[in-house]
């Protein structure tokens, strides 16, 4: 049996899972798929292929599904792999990086369909209050080259060299099982998705472990396949709710309130701008719910 296991979490992933699974199985790693109550034939396709499958009757969220996968397979090294990612190389460089002194895990290089590295996504710095404030207030979109955003998204980083990093993307991320156990797994409070992998990396570093980026390990990544399935309002609520949960866990209470205030202000700015562009009150209503969520957090302190 391989000492590497692969966990793939699916949610309405029938169109992508075939190519992902073919590459995962070809790697020789033990593979388990955890499906979060897909309705598009994903489960039927997985059963047809005879893959090891946990088919949830309800959506457990990404973190919950990953934790289920870890409980199912016992390999000492576990790769988290998105269903829209296709492994293009050996996984051995990732395993070797996991064996470096004090290493908790390693992420590989993600490339788009044209083979271009996904700079700004595959490795990031851990979010700071300043980074999230600028994000909430639209300043990163209006001035993407600002120093805070350049550091957060690692826009000046050399993707051709191995390096210690703060936050490899969870789409192609190998973790030592012992570290997952020590940290108690991913935080299932980040439901159904977003920021759970960021929080996990933050907790890894708080424990004094290191994380690495390994360019020799490569996967082609489409990205965002499940996001369009969410209605605009729920997409915004989930993303901002997870952002606020991360901020409450990792920032000083004063800085958490600053982030909350920025989200309130930014929600009104975004709502007005998008409603004007689309000539619809729907974005304003959606961002109004986000502002309400952040406002409650501002006054409750969590």
Q: Whereabouts are the PLM-identified features?
A:
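Glycine-rich, basic loop-to-helix element that forms the pyrophosphate-binding segment
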Residues: 55-73, 89
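Short aromatic/hydrophobic "clamp" motif used to bind/position activated sugar donors
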Residues: 78
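A short, conserved alpha-helix in the catalytic core of glycosyltransferases
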Residues: 158-161, 166-185, 189-218
């Amino acid at each position: 049996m391989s000492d590497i296991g692969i966990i793939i979490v699916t949610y309405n992933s029938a169109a992508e899972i075939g190519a992902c699974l073919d590459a995962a199985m070809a790697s020789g790693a033990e593979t388990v798929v955890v499906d979060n109550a897909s309705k598009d034939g994903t489960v039927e396709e997985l059963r047809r292929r005879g893959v090891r499958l946990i088919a949830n009757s309800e959506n457990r969220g990404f973190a919950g599904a990953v934790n289920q996968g870890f409980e199912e397979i016992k390999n000492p090294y576990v790769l988290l792999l998105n269903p829209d990612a296709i492994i293009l190389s050996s996984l051995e460089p990732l395993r070797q990086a996991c064996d470096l002194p004090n290493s908790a895990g390693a992420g590989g290089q993600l490339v788009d369909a044209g083979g271009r590295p996904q700079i700004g996504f595959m490795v990031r710095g851990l979010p700071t209050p300043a980074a999230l404030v600028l994000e909430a207030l639209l300043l990163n979109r209006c001035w993407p080259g600002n120093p805070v955003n350049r550091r957060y998204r690692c826009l000046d980083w050399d993707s051709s060299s191995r390096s210690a990093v703060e936050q490899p993307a969870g789409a192609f991320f190998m973790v030592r099982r012992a570290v997952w156990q020590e940290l108690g797994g991913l935080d299932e409070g980040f439901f159904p998705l977003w920021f759970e992998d960021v929080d996990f990396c933050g907790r890894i570093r708080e424990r004094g472990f290191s994380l690495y980026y390994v360019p020799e390990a490569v996967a082609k990544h489409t990205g965002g396949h499940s996001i369009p399935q969410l209605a605009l309002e729920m997409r915004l609520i989930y993303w901002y709710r997870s952002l606020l949960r991360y901020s409450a866990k990792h920032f000083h209470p004063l800085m958490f309130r600053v982030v909350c205030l920025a989200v309130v202000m930014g929600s009104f700015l975004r709502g007005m701008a998008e409603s004007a562009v689309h000539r619809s009150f729907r974005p304003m209503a959606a961002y109004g719910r986000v502002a309400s969520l952040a406002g409650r957090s501002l006054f409750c302190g969590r």
